[in-house]
């Protein structure tokens, strides 16, 4: 498919109309009734993928809903689009690129020919180079300019070059075992870099500058400031031993002072938000080692193979993506809460925000025509139990429908006994997980509350309406492989929704104009003379006020 080819409007198909009529039929049927009518759904509406046990029974769907959603996916040719992606077809139509993040986790003996090259060989050549480098770093063979071993790596990137590594490093902190810690700088706000470097020793710090083009404004601004910090302490010659690059622009990397032997590349068929398992993950590999990083990749591949081969009726990413679409397009939900009951996954929701919102936040279909329905889910969330004391009130008793994903683990990485000595703190955490999904689904009626002797005036305030849907994802333990499985599970949900909506989930033109305008405004707010008048009165007034408060001519 190219962008010039017309895409059928999915909302004008019989499959869409069948779902609309089905919604009218089941209406606001409560999950209490749905479970009463189908008591085995808690066992039947589950799927196991790798180490992930996924329970989607607490959704406002029936078995007929699932059948109709699968019909919709087949009407949109989801399986054909999926096969094209895995084969390396240029499904990113607006940029005429293949979409091959799945190739980043193919085993070494696999073969995938794209544009005349076996990309698996290229992928593993980079992985081998990353492994050799991080082995030297972790063993102490690689030292800084003074001969001291490196103890801290600072990743400088933004967007996909930051959100993924930050999230994964925190999630897998227990696998960092070589005396190397990682820190991350992304924001061009100088407070980010200053706070990160405040207690570091230049002699034991290594910077990883992650920018495909090596021209990203925020990243290069931070990298230049970090280089100044280093050279002020150790001299210009130290740069080659304290900076490496993740980039494809050899000339600019060399101009910066980084030895191009220490440049780790990737490809234009890897989008930033899908790149944490590429060389962008170098900081993660430095911390956890090449073996654990290989386990991380193997987890992705497990779910990739499931998505590639499983029938849609039992295909976890496809089903969850279609259920998300059901809420977005037929029940009016605008967001999804991601609620990991693991503090190590504190950054998972932020990571998924870029994955889904940059991918599917589109109002134009791949053929250039306007979409005819809402697209894109707004992801947000915090770890349990923190969220319970912040925003769960709205989930339980508010007027907005917010489907939620609960993610938990049977075996904790850390645990402590409770004061009472019964069970452990992890057991307490997970009892909250199970309780919240149960109360969201089934609630508590006015009659039940009144029967407890609650004053009549208070009863309405304590009613828990229920009928609030959720997915429960349970794994044994948070390991590198399990984390890879979780990420791939959401990647393919995003793909599923994008195909049905007919959009290009792999471009991001919406971020470009703001960057261009920022470059144009920088000399306006910094020039010595009176600034050029802006095209609108609001921006003009803001610029002039800022200049005045900075001591420049208004």
UniProtKB/Swiss-Prot annotation:
The protein's enzyme class: isomerase
Entries under InterPro entries matching the protein: G6P_Isomerase, G6P_Isomerase_C, Phosphoglucose_isomerase_CS, SIS_dom_sf, SIS_PGI_1, SIS_PGI_2
Localization per record: Cytoplasm
Chain segments carrying region Disordered: 527-554
Active site: 358, 389, 515
An example molecular function term from Gene Ontology annotations: monosaccharide binding
NCBIfam families tied to this protein: PRK00179.1
Family recorded in the similarity comment: Belongs to the GPI family.
Protein name per Swiss-Prot or TrEMBL: Glucose-6-phosphate isomerase
Source organism phylogeny: Bacteria, Bacillati, Actinomycetota, Actinomycetes, Mycobacteriales
Gene: pgi
């Amino acid at each position: 498919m190219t962008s010039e080819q017309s895409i059928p409007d999915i909302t004008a198909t019989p499959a869409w109309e069948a779902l609309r009529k089905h919604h009218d039929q089941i209406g606001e049927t409560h999950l209490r009734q749905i479970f009463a009518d189908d008591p085995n759904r808690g066992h039947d509406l589950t799927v196991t993928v790798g180490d992930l046990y996924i329970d989607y029974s607490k959704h406002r769907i029936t078995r007929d809903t699932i059948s109709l959603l699968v019909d919709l996916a087949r009407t949109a040719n989801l399986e054909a689009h999926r096969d094209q992606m895995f084969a390396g077809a240029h499904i990113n139509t607006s940029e005429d690129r293949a979409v091959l993040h799945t190739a980043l986790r193919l085993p070494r003996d696999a073969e995938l020919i794209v544009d005349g090259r076996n990309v698996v060989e290229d992928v593993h050549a980079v992985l081998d180079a990353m492994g050799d480098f991080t082995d030297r770093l972790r063993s102490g063979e690689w030292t800084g300019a003074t001969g001291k071993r490196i103890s801290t790596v600072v990743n400088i990137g933004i967007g996909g070059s930051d959100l993924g590594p930050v999230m994964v490093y925190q999630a897998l902190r227990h696998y960092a075992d070589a005396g190397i810690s990682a820190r991350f700088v992304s924001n061009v706000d100088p407070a980010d870099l200053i706070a990160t470097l405040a207690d570091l020793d230049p002699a034991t710090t290594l910077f990883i500058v992650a920018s495909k083009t090596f021209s990203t404004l925020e990243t290069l601004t931070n990298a230049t400031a970090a280089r100044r910090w280093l050279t002020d302490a150790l001299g210009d010659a130290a740069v080659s031993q304290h900076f490496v690059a993740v980039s494809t622009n050899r000339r600019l990397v060399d101009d910066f002072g980084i030895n191009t032997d220490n440049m780790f590349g990737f490809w234009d068929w890897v989008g930033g938000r899908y790149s944490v398992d590429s060389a962008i993950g170098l900081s993660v590999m430095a911390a956890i080692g090449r073996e654990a990083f290989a386990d991380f990749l193997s987890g992705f591949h497990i779910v990739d193979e499931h998505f590639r081969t499983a029938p849609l009726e039992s295909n976890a990413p496809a089903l969850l993506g279609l259920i998300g679409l059901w809420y977005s397009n037929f029940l009016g939900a605008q967001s999804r809460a991601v609620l990991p009951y693991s503090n190590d996954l504190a950054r998972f929701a932020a990571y998924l925000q870029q994955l889904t919102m940059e991918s599917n936040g589109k109002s134009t279909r791949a053929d250039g025509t306007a979409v005819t329905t809402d697209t894109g889910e707004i992801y947000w969330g915090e770890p349990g139990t923190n969220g319970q004391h912040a925003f769960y009130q709205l989930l339980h008793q508010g007027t907005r429908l917010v489907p939620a994903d609960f993610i938990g683990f049977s075996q904790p990485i850390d645990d402590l006994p409770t004061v009472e000595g019964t069970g452990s703190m992890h057991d307490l955490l997970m009892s909250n997980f199970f309780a919240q999904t149960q109360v969201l689904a089934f609630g508590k009626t006015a009659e039940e509350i009144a029967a407890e002797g609650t004053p009549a005036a208070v009863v309405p305030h304590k009613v828990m309406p229920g009928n609030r849907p959720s997915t429960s994802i349970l794994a044994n333990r948070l390991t590198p492989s399990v984390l890879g499985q979780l990420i791939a599970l959401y990647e393919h949900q995003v793909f599923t929704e994008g195909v049905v909506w007919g959009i290009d989930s792999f471009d991001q033109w919406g971020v470009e104009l703001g960057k261009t305008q920022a470059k144009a405004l920088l000399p306006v707010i910094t020039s010595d003379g009176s600034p050029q008048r802006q095209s609108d009165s609001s921006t003009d007034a803001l610029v002039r006020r800022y200049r005045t408060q900075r001591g420049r001519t208004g």
